[in-house]
């Protein structure tokens, strides 16, 4: 396709556009830089709309801890066994057969406490495989399966251990439990999210927070393009972070996209950023030079307006001396 005469524009912010031709050139440079890596971007046209999609690297720049969800939304929570199941013997026996519940009303306590002389309790087992209660143990009101349930509760089975491991998730290679209430990612560590060029800054923020199950509101954070010079440019709510990354260039040694607290970071313009790297003595010398230049400009303006004031006064005197004509 010949793009030489193409005039279609791609939005890159509120009332800001870039030609598709220029964006394709930036995209080509971007993909050449990440050739053979999963950070390469793809583009397509959908209903005459030019869409770029792929992974966006975002660096953590948080100073305060973030709150993590106590439970995973996708986790299946098994309810604890009810009190009736602990005393009914409804679990599987040792041979895999289900034992029927032994109900308390069938045990005749009066016969156990006062048996007639010479009579003995039958020693044979009933059809359920359970022996009747003996004379000297009237207080045991549980079945053998109940004992098994209690014993297994004190030991973690391999399935329980696997379930506990599934509670854990990774942030930049470090595993944390969902039940951990707060966490602060290492400053400068990198993560990524899969987005497209139609997603605005708030949408990207929500996607990133949902990825790591962070409870904090997206309103607390902002995305910044941070340059090695110290310049910090906040992405507006109407900006498209993926487009901004493409236009900044692929090299993260020059600029990175940071997630930061909205109320903790101030934007730094290019004019200010070019002085950040200097030492204090050098900066003081700059201030002195600027002060001297300011003084020279002030004196120049004072001389200029002094001359103008004298000229105006001289003209007023000339008008006053001239007789009025009728």
From Swiss-Prot:
Q: Which subcellular locations apply to this protein?
A: Nucleus; Cytoplasm; Chromosome, Centromere, Kinetochore
What does the PTM comment of the record read? Answer: Phosphorylated by STK3/MST2 and STK4/MST1.
Q: Which residue stretches belong to region Disordered?
A: 111-133
- The residue ranges of the SARAH domain are 272-319
In this protein, which residues make up the domain named Ras-associating?
A: 176-264
List the GO terms this entry assigns under cellular component, sorted alphabetically: cytoplasm; cytosol; Golgi apparatus; kinetochore; nucleoplasm; nucleus; plasma membrane; protein-containing complex
The source organism is Homo sapiens (Human)
Keyword entries, A-Z: Cell cycle, Centromere, Chromosome, Cytoplasm, Kinetochore, Nucleus, Phosphoprotein, Tumor suppressor
How this chain assembles, per its entry, is: Interacts directly with activated KRAS in a GTP-dependent manner. Interacts (via SARAH domain) with STK3/MST2 and STK4/MST1.
Q: Name one GO biological process term.
A: bone remodeling
Listed as disulfide-bonded, the cysteine pairs are none
Where it mainly occurs, coarsely classed, is nucleus
Protein name in UniProt = Ras association domain-containing protein 2
List the gene name: RASSF2
SUPFAM superfamilies for the chain: Ubiquitin-like
For molecular function, the Gene Ontology terms on record are:
protein kinase activity
Q: In which tissues has expression of this protein been reported?
A: Widely expressed with highest levels in brain, placenta, peripheral blood and lung. Frequently down-regulated in lung tumor cell lines.
**Taxonomic lineage of the native organism:** Eukaryota, Metazoa, Chordata, Craniata, Vertebrata
InterPro entries, per this entry? Answer: RA_dom (IPR000159), RASSF1-6 (IPR033614), RASSF2_RA (IPR033618), SARAH_dom (IPR011524), Ubiquitin-like_domsf (IPR029071)
Q: What is the annotated role of this protein in its UniProt record?
A: Potential tumor suppressor. Acts as a KRAS-specific effector protein. May promote apoptosis and cell cycle arrest. Stabilizes STK3/MST2 by protecting it from proteasomal degradation.
């Amino acid at each position: 396709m010949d793009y030489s005469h193409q005039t279609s524009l791609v939005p890159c912010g509120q009332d800001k556009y870039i030609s598709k031709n220029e964006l394709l050139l930036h995209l080509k440079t971007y993909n050449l830089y990440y050739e053979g890596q999963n950070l390469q971007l793809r583009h397509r046209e959908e209903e005459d709309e030019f869409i770029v999609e792929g992974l966006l690297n975002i660096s953590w720049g948080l100073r305060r801890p973030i709150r993590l969800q106590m439970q995973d939304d996708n986790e299946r929570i098994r309810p604890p066994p009810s009190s009736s199941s602990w005393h009914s013997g409804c679990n599987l026996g040792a041979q895999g057969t289900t034992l029927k519940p032994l109900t308390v009303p069938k045990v005749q306590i009066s016969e156990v406490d006062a048996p007639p002389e010479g009579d003995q309790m039958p020693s044979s087992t009933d059809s359920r495989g359970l022996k009747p209660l003996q004379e000297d143990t009237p207080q045991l009101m549980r079945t053998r399966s109940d004992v098994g349930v209690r014993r297994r509760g004190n030991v973690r089975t391999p399935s329980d251990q696997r379930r506990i491991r599934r509670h854990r998730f990774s942030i930049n290679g470090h595993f944390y439990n969902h039940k951990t209430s707060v966490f602060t990612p290492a400053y400068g560590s990198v993560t990524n999210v899969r987005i497209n060029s139609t997603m605005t800054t708030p949408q990207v923020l929500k996607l990133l927070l949902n990825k790591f199950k962070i409870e904090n509101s997206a309103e607390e954070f902002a995305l910044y393009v941070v340059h090695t010079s110290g310049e910090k440019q906040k992405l507006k709510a109407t900006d498209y972070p993926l487009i901004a990354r493409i236009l900044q260039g692929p090299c993260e040694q020059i600029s990175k996209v940071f997630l930061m607290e909205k109320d903790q970071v101030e934007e730094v313009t290019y004019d200010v950023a070019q002085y950040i790297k200097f030492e204090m003595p050098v900066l003081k010398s700059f201030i002195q030079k600027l002060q001297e230049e300011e003084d020279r400009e002030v004196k120049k303006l004072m001389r200029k307006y002094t001359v103008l004031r004298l000229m105006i006064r001289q003209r007023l005197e000339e008008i006053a001396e001239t007789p009025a004509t009728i």
